[in-house]
């Protein structure tokens, strides 16, 4: 049950673990359900000997990173539990946030604009890319993005919730406008991240609608046939992307569920 991240089933087996260990299991169950307040409540009074939320020091605002990284850990647990349909269904909202974070890094560094300045948040609970703000603040990039859409027989950008497809074209448009010379390391990093985002776009386009609306069972083999890598390799690529995009990212976070599982096994 620990290996499959089935913490809910362990909680139902009352008295199977000591009270402190059951509190840790309750923390993991709430955390894997993205119930942050509940997860932190169960940590009170526990002395684990390691940080449950490892993070690099002096990293500034953690709210966006914490949300994105915890969502990724849930996706990684789906992959480990071989719940590939759930993994693909969660990929779309996760990747859009990751694309926004990377666009923010590039826009701040090379264009003097933050991604927040281009987003409207009055679209219900969803964010959207503002066409007006994009044309006002980055007219050349906006024109380039529209041309890329027209080249693909798509209409120019409208006021809509963002998509992986639109953000990939936006990213290409931003990279194309970078004037200053890039180091070899910067070039490699950009190439790797663009490749990852395009890979995820293919996966999302191929399977998301069928996973959401049809009685399908996605397998690792089907995913590998689509993108040329299995989900374990894709998870590793996403981990590298998180490290590249977020200075706060401590790679120890990626193994925190294993660390907690090991703690439970040792102290059982």
Which residues fall in each region the model found?
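Charged alpha-helical initiation segments
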Residues: 2, 18-84
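Amphipathic alpha-helices that form helix-helix packing interfaces
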Residues: 27, 46, 68-71, 75, ...
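Amphipathic alpha-helical interface elements
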Residues: 62-174
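Conserved non-transmembrane functional hotspots
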Residues: 255-268
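Amphipathic, non-membrane alpha-helical rod segments
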Residues: 7-16, 230-234
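Short, flexible helical or helix-coil boundary motifs
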Residues: 50-53, 141, 145-152, 173-185, ...
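Solenoid-repeat scaffolds in large eukaryotic assemblies
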Residues: 6-13, 36-42, 87-88
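Charge-enriched, short contiguous segments at helix-coil
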Residues: 177-254
């Amino acid at each position: 049950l620990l290996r499959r991240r089935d913490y809910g089933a362990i909680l139902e087996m009352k008295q199977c673990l000591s009270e402190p260990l059951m509190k840790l299991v309750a923390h993991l169950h709430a955390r894997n359900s993205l119930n942050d307040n509940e997860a932190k409540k169960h940590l009170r009074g526990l002395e684990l000997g390691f940080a449950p939320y490892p993070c690099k020091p002096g990293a500034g605002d953690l709210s966006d990173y914490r949300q994105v990284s915890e969502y990724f850990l849930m996706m990684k647990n789906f992959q480990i539990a071989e719940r590939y349909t759930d993994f693909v269904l969660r990929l779309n909202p996760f990747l859009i946030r990751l694309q926004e974070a990377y666009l923010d890094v590039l826009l701040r560094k090379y264009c003097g604009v933050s991604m927040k300045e281009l987003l409207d948040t009055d679209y219900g609970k969803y964010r959207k890319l503002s066409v007006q703000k994009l044309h006002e603040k980055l007219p050349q990039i906006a024109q380039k993005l529209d041309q890329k859409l027209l080249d693909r027989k798509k209409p120019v950008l409208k006021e809509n919730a963002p998509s992986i497809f639109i953000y990939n074209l936006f990213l290409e448009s931003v990279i194309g406008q970078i004037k200053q010379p890039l180091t070899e390391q910067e070039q490699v990093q950009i190439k790797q991240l663009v490749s990852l985002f395009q890979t995820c776009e293919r996966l999302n386009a191929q399977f998301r609608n069928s996973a959401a609306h049809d009685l399908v069972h996605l397998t690792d083999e089907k995913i590998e046939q689509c993108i040329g890598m299995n989900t374990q390799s894709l998870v590793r690529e996403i981990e590298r992307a998180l490290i590249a995009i977020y200075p706060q990212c401590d790679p120890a976070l990626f193994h925190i569920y294993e660390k907690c599982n090991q703690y439970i096994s040792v102290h059982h």
